[in-house]
Structure formats: C-alpha cells, structure tokens
Amino acid sequence: MHGHRAPGGAGPSEPEHPATNPPGAAPPACADSDPGASEPGLLARRGSGSALGGPLDPQFVGPSDTSLGAAPGHRVLPCGPSPQHHRALRFSYHLEGSQPRPGLHQGNRILVKSLSLDPGQSLEPHPEGPQRLRSDPGPPTETPSQRPSPLKRAPGPKPQVPPKPSYLQMPRMPPPLEPIPPPPSRPLPADPRVAKGLAPRAEASPSSAAVSSLIEKFEREPVIVASDRPVPGPSPGPPEPVMLPQPTSQPPVPQLPEGEASRCLFLLAPGPRDGEKVPNRDSGIDSISSPSNSEETCFVSDDGPPSHSLCPGPPALASVPVALADPHRPGSQEVDSDLEEEDDEEEEEEKDREIPVPLMERQESVELTVQQKVFHIANELLQTEKAYVSRLHLLDQVFCARLLEEARNRSSFPADVVHGIFSNICSIYCFHQQFLLPELEKRMEEWDRYPRIGDILQKLAPFLKMYGEYVKNFDRAVELVNTWTERSTQFKVIIHEVQKEEACGNLTLQHHMLEPVQRIPRYELLLKDYLLKLPHGSPDSKDAQKSLELIATAAEHSNAAIRKMERMHKLLKVYELLGGEEDIVSPTKELIKEGHILKLSAKNGTTQDRYLILFNDRLLYCVPRLRLLGQKFSVRARIDVDGMELKESSNLNLPRTFLVSGKQRSLELQARTEEEKKDWVQAINSTLLKHEQTLETFKLLNSTNREDEDTPPNSPNVDLGKRAPTPIREKEVTMCMRCQEPFNSITKRRHHCKACGHVVCGKCSEFRARLVYDNNRSNRVCTDCYVALHGVPGSSPACSQHTPQRRRSILEKQASVAAENSVICSFLHYMEKGGKGWHKAWFVVPENEPLVLYIYGAPQDVKAQRSLPLIGFEVGPPEAGERPDRRHVFKITQSHLSWYFSPETEELQRRWMAVLGRAGRGDTFCPGPTLSEDREMEEAPVAALGATAEPPESPQTRDKT
C-alpha cells in the first residue's frame, strides 16, 4: 500500500494501518532502516525490473530513487541509510523474508542489488533472517509472532563486485544519424513475471521506459559505473519539487531548478512526436523497432565526463551528445549554445537552398535541357560510331589480314576459310570508315549552325542493306572459326595472339564478329530516342522519320536473311535425310512440315509406315530404308501442290483418315492421333491457299484451268490421264465395275484402271494408253477410258460386249455414290430367319429413297445384291427364346419375315434401330436420330404402322430438327 503525501507536501504523513495486501500486490515497505535489509539471502533472478529498470513501486524506492520510478505526490518510506551516490551494477535480485517489523505487517521484501553504498564503502554483514524464494507463495498472511525457521547458508559477507576500470568508463561516441524504423502497430505485452510480484500502480510516468531500457542494457552489456542524480518524474502539471526524507547524517539532495528539471525530463522520456508511436508504458519496453542498445539510456554522473544521452525520441535529439544540465557544473550552458548555433546555421543553409527559381529562368533551363538531350543523343551516335569503326578495323585489318597472310604465305589453312569467316566485312568497314563516320564528325563540329543528323542518315541508310549478307553468313562463320581452331594449330595461335592485344579488350574473335549483327538494331534504337527528344516542329523531324524507315527496312532485310538461312539449314538436313537422292536445296523452296504418317494400302487397306515431306511447291511421299549409318528415306512419289486436292475420307470405319489427291498420285493417309491429323490438314490447306494466291498474283491461272482444278477427279468432265485417279481398294469391290461379273481368285482377278482408278476384270482392261501424269508412259486402262482417250477401237474382242445397249437394272446403283448421299450406311452382319449363318454386307439407306434398304457386297460395288422395302417392318430386340451368338443384335419383322442385324458398336445399333423404325412407320428422315429418339428406341421397341405406302419416285424432304 502506498503512503499518502501530507497536504503541505513537505514531510511524510503518518503510516497507514497495516492491512493484508490484495493478491498480486507488493507488500508494504519498511518504516525505518533495517540492519538486515541489505543482507544477501536466498536470491531469485528477476525477469525484468531492478534498481534502474522497470517501474518500481514507491514503497521499494530508497531516499534517492525518485528518479527511478517514484512519482510525485507519493510517500517514500526509508529502508535504511540512504547514500548520495549509487553504483549501477549488472545484476538484480529478489530477496524475501527478513526480521519482522514492529507495528507493520511483514510481507515480501525486495533487495535491489544495483543500489549500494559509496564506491569505497563495503557492505556490512547482517544477521541471517528467514528467507524464501520469491516464487514460493508461502502462507497467505503472516503475523509478527510467526517467523519461519532460518535457512542454512555459508557464513561470511557477500563479495563486492569490483568497479570497472577507468579506461572502460569513457563515454561512447554517438552513432551516425540514421532514420529510426517505424514501430510496430501495437506495443509489446508486459512481462507476466513482473506482474506477479509488483503491486498495482497508477499510470507509469514516461521515465519508466528509460528505466526499463537500463535493465535490458545491464543484462546484455558490461557494467557501467555511474552516479545517479535524483530526477523528478513527469506530471500533468508543472513539476513540483519533491522532498525526500534524509537521515541527519546525510545532507539533503539538492533540487533542480524548474527549467533544468523539465529539460532532464524531456531528455529522459520524450513525448510522442508527429509520426511516432507512444512507447509501451505497461511493460516498460519500447517498440520492437526502436533501438535497444546501450545508447538509449541516460546517465548522470558527478565525477566522470559528461555521458551521452540517446533516449528514445526524435532523431535530432537521439543523435546529438547531450549532458544533463547541472547548475553546479560549468560548461553545460556552453555546450547547449554551441549545438543551437550549429542547428541555426544548418537551417539557414537549407533555406538558402530552397530559394525559388524565377519562372523565366526555369523555362530557359527547360529549353536548354531539350536541346542538350538532342545533342547528347547525336553525340552518343558519334561516339558509338567511333568505337564501332575501331572494332571493324580490328576485324578487317588485324584478324583478317594476319590470317590471309598466313594462308597465302605458308598455306597452313585455305584462304577460302578466311573469306568464309569474314564475308563482306571489308565493304562494311570501308563504308563506315570513309563515309558515315566522317559525315557524323563534320556535322557534330557544325552542330551550332546545323543541329540535325536526319539528312545524313537518310542519305546513307540504304547502304546498310549490305549487312544482310554478313548476317546470313554469321552462323557458318562462327562454325568455321570453331572448326579451324581445333584443326589448325597455326590458325589457333594467330587468333590467340590477336586476342591478347590491348585493342582487343580481352574479348574473343566471336564477340567482335557479333557486333556488326547488333549494329543496325542499335541505330534503330538511337534514332527512335532522337525522334522522341526532338521538339515539336523541328526541321529535322521529317528527315529523321524517313531515316528511321530506311533503317527499319535494313533491319527487316537482315532478319529476312536470317530466316532464309535458317530455312536453308532445314533444307540441307532434309537433303542429308534423303541421302542426296532429291535435289531440294533451292532458294525458292521452303520446308513446311515433315513427319511420319500411316498410309492405307489401295489393295487391302492395311496401314504402312511412311514419311511425308511437305514443301511450298510439292509433297514428297517417302518410304524408309535401312542403312549402316542410320535410317534414311527413299522418295516413292512426288505430288505437285499445283492441282492438289485435300478431302475427308467417307469411310466411317477408318477414323483419322484423309485423302490427298494430286496430278501424280492420290494417297489415303491415316494419322495416329486427332491432333496429328489436324496439324497435317492445316499445313496442307495453308500451302494450297498460298499457292493459289501466288498464281493469282502472277496471273498464271486462267478460267479454263480454274474449271479443271475445281472439278473433282472422278467426274466425267475431267480429262483422263492428266492427273492421277483416286484408286479404289480391291477389297471394297466384289464385282467388276464395268461388266458387273463377280470376282474370284482364279478366273476373275482384279485389275486397276490407271486412268479412272476403278477395279475391273481382265477382259475389261485389255487396253493400254499413254498417260500424261505418268510422263506419257503406257499404262493399263479400262475399255471406257480407252474409248475416251483414243476413240472406239476397230477390232477389239471387248468392243462387241459394249456395243449393244442393254436395259439398266434398278439395282445398278453405285454404292459409293449412294453412300455419299445417304441417311445411314455401314457394314452389318445379317441373317435371315431360318438361315444357317451370319453374312457381312454393306447396307445403305439412300436419301432419295429413304424407305428402301440396299444391300451391297462392298462399299464400291456398282450394283446392289438386293433391296428391301422397309414400310411395315417392326424394329425391336430379339425375343427371349432366341439366343444369337453375336453382340448388339436387333431384328425387323413383318408377317412371317424376320431379319437379324448385328452392328459393330452399341452406338451404331441405336442409330440403325432409329432409322429403320422411322422407315417402318413411313416417316421422312432427318440426317440422324436425336439422342432422345435413341433412348426411346433403346427402352422400348417402336410399334410398326399397319398402313403401307408406295415408294416415292422423287427424293423426300427430310425433317429439320
């Protein structure tokens, strides 16, 4: 409990009646000096707080401890003899238990180790008293009669800590001015260990932060011995003089004047400034961003030199060495006056710097700055041109000259190698050294009269196109340097000798060879910057813009040369891939795409691995061949882009297929993935489009040729023999496509007509004719094609068969034509009721006859085996007693007639059931059944209509859903 100050504030009032302290509160201090108060007992290290650290309660503060936490207006009870000076030591301890005090309630007591007697005075031993650890809660209350048994400890006084040597007590130099980082958003929490042992108190004064920082300083750094002078704590009002009770043997501590006390309080605990945070007063610790070194605290010493006061506060105060004002010490006023004079001088200098410049002067300086920027860019162009010419001189007159001399005199390596490395570097060097650089130097000398460079660049920029040849040859030149450096020792020696010279700048030959490649883009960047800095309406703007366009054209010319060289490298790789068989290295030829692909055989439809190489003018069809040096390819066919057509395959059973038809040959190709097919189709289409645009540009495509190109190859208007036909696979035909006789492997073998691509028998292909697309070589053709090419033969055994005009059967409907315009078509396995086995056939429902089902032996047959009217048939799954031996089986029934069908997939089964069900009801057809119709057909069979209708003679109109 705190004692209250007397109304007069001069002397201490009577002590309050003893009472039990509330939980967590500190016990009352002793009323008078106790010889055992300074005796060391069982000590416990305190987490935070000591004589100079953390806010201390008034009852634990000695007579001279007002500056350490005793707020004005509180009574401070003495606890023994009070010295004038205290020694600040590194340690702080807690001591509990001592002799009971008469008249006061005995509780826990704290012995502060950092408060001691004079430097030469030693601690006197005191009799042992009962002691216990601070952490031991002990009994809740104690009476004077209750006294715990004393603990045993070693006899003898506690050793005194020796003072610090004088050379270690020198004041430290202030740290340099540095901005203090911003504090955290909220203060740090108080130490819970301190809250347990300290009594509840009012709001701590700002000086508690400085005291707490002293504790941290003593715990981290060596001991600094200094004398403390009482400093009153801050108060809301004007500071009042604090009267401390002093023993009769000691003189009273002199009080500071009001002004000096305020100055010390400001230095010890400054208030918050603008933009700063208030320190954490509860914990006695500043923000984590505030410096916590030893310079934060403030010391007052009577004997030693003035210490530096670097308290937390504004940087201007924290960085200047300050001595606390002492009215009895001379020189303090002089120090303050010197500091004030220096601050005044700095403020005057800053004001002089901030004198505003008149408006007219600022405008003139801005105009001069624009002119200077333009001049600097032009001067930069000149300086970089000088450095560039020196590099060209090094390449042409040093590297190239020495290598040519060695090649011509000693023949250590061919002279062609040197010419291949340096290309036209001699012409580039002459242009820059004799033309461009002198013009720029002359213009910069006359810059005051002619401040422009656009006219010079406009005149000489077209000559920069010569860089295209050098850039195109750069990769080959670097490769030659690397190759001959390893192959020829003398070549390597010359290169290394030149690279060691000072003019080379410790760079390799390859680095210097790269500079001409980078020079034109640098011209472009400098000229763009020059145009940006030119003032509006400058006379040089037009010439500079024109020069920029010419330089950009030269840069594009160089880039085009680079791209052309890259294309040439690709052509060379393909040339090596083909083993030199095909002459494809040409400036006009460009590689578009290459890669593996599957080719479908024209006879049996098997897949074969092939390699396609697409150029801008032709397609190479290659087959792989094995060699000792690796896999190479041989060209099997060459298809020109002129006249090439790309089609999608109509065969549903072969996914990812497409057809390439050209004048020389037609190929049916299959990709391994959908992405691969998409890439090939896109590449071929883009090539065809570019070729068409080229023909239109040069007006080489007339109207007649356009009709021939736009006409499908198999149409009757095509001139036979001028382009390769699309061959029909032999397995897709079961009969001769001319005489309609069925094939067999012995008497009726299959042959292909090289003019139309149809599959015919031997009797129908006895003629031979020269075909234009095959370089006028003789090929087997059918009778109809021979008649179209050469007219009716005079004596031909096959001619008599075609002379009489026979009546055409209703079944003579070509399957391929019907399939192209059909509602649905696919292979199905079928079996009639009572049949012995399943048969495979090609079924088609044509669009022009949607109520009739045609059955073909193969997709390319010219005549159907039979036809089946669908009206009146009911579609449904097989009955429970019928156990077909195939999957996805459904049947159509009418009266006593039943047909069983088995598609390959379940999706195909749903589509066929939907189409046949609608045809059985006599409905018209849409291109394909909807998903809802498929589900309805899957869930329940469709009831057939009893009415019948005649087959329509004209094509039916389909419903559009």
From Swiss-Prot:
UniProt biased composition (Pro residues): 156-165, 172-190, 231-255
Domain PH: 590-689, 821-921
Superkingdom field: Eukaryota
CDD domains hit by this protein: FYVE_FGD1_2_4, PH1_FGD1, PH2_FGD1-4, RhoGEF
InterPro entries, sorted: DBL_dom_sf, DH_dom, FGD1-4_PH2, FGD1_PH1, FYVE_RhoGEF_PH, PH-like_dom_sf, PH_domain, Znf_FYVE
Biased composition (Basic and acidic residues): 125-135, 273-284
Subcellular location: Cytoplasm; Cell projection, Lamellipodium; Cell projection, Ruffle; Cytoplasm, Cytoskeleton
Tissue localization of expression: Expressed in fetal heart, brain, lung, kidney and placenta. Less expressed in liver; adult heart, brain, lung, pancreas and skeletal muscle.
SUPFAM superfamilies named in the record: DBL homology domain (DH-domain) (SSF48065), PH domain-like (SSF50729)
Its biological purpose: Activates CDC42, a member of the Ras-like family of Rho- and Rac proteins, by exchanging bound GDP for free GTP. Plays a role in regulating the actin cytoskeleton and cell shape.
Residue numbers covered by motif SH3-binding: 171-187
Segments forming FYVE-type zinc fingers: 730-790
Annotated PROSITE patterns: DH_2 (PS50010), PH_DOMAIN (PS50003), ZF_FYVE (PS50178)
Binding-site residues, Zn(2+) 1: C736, C739, C761, C764
Keyword tags: Cell projection, Cytoplasm, Cytoskeleton, Disease variant, Guanine-nucleotide releasing factor, Metal-binding, Phosphoprotein, Repeat, Zinc, Zinc-finger
Chloroplast listed as a keyword: no
Domain (DH) ranges: 373-561
Domain notes for this protein: The DH domain is involved in interaction with CCPG1.
Low complexity biased stretches: 27-38, 199-213, 285-294, 316-325
Residue list for modification Phosphoserine: S48, S205, S715
Protein name: FYVE, RhoGEF and PH domain-containing protein 1
Chain intervals with Acidic residues compositional bias: 335-351
GO cellular component: cytoplasm; cytoskeleton; cytosol; Golgi apparatus; lamellipodium; plasma membrane; ruffle
